[in-house]
Swiss-Prot record:
Coiled coil: none annotated. The gene is queC. Its EC number is 6.3.4.20. It comes from Stenotrophomonas maltophilia (strain R551-3). Keywords: ATP-binding, Ligase, Metal-binding, Nucleotide-binding, Queuosine biosynthesis, Zinc. This is 7-cyano-7-deazaguanine synthase. Belongs to the QueC family. The keyword Zinc applies. It comes from the Bacteria.
Amino acid sequence: MKKAVVLLSGGMDSAAVIAMAQEQGFAVHALSVRYGQRHTSELDAAARVAKAQGVIAHKTVDVDLRSIGGSALTDDIDVPEAGGAGIPVTYVPARNTIMLSLALGWAEVLGANDIFCGVNAVDYSGYPDCRPEFVAAFQALANLATKSGVEGAGIKVHAPLQFLSKGQIVSEGVRLGVDFGLTVSCYNADANGAACSHCDACRLRAQGFTEAGVADPTLYA
């Protein structure tokens, strides 16, 4: 069976991506990153999702981005209750670049030719590293910067949620049997994973279930 590395945050998007990769016949190796995020309950959620969805392996890598700072998700900066103009304070500098680079490295070690991520450019918070241009640029990097890219078949970067709305993501996940009740999306989630219901991540998540006509399984504080 062909192997793939899938980035798994513990949120609803990455849970859906795992199911999509499995439907395509991939043996999924899930990769989570402990980057110093304040909402560590998402990593507990990642472990639950990995177990429930039967991945081949689940690895958590430590890269402490608190030493760099610059984000409300790592620093002592308040998370806003509503999205505003421009790039929000919840943007973590270079996070997706770092995470995809780790996935790329693990894929090379595993001999995998595919990596998956859950970036989304439709219903998202304005992050520059969720845009289609970013995914295309990282694909070019993967082609140039890896042994596999230079000597072999290369490593393909998949972003299957890129042009889906949150409602479409929920519908697709439900079709594939994803238990979204296991996931955590909230930027302010407590130690038990209970969501605040006010932040932008909570707003987008609730919007997705409403659009899909699916009961929201989220645990709220």
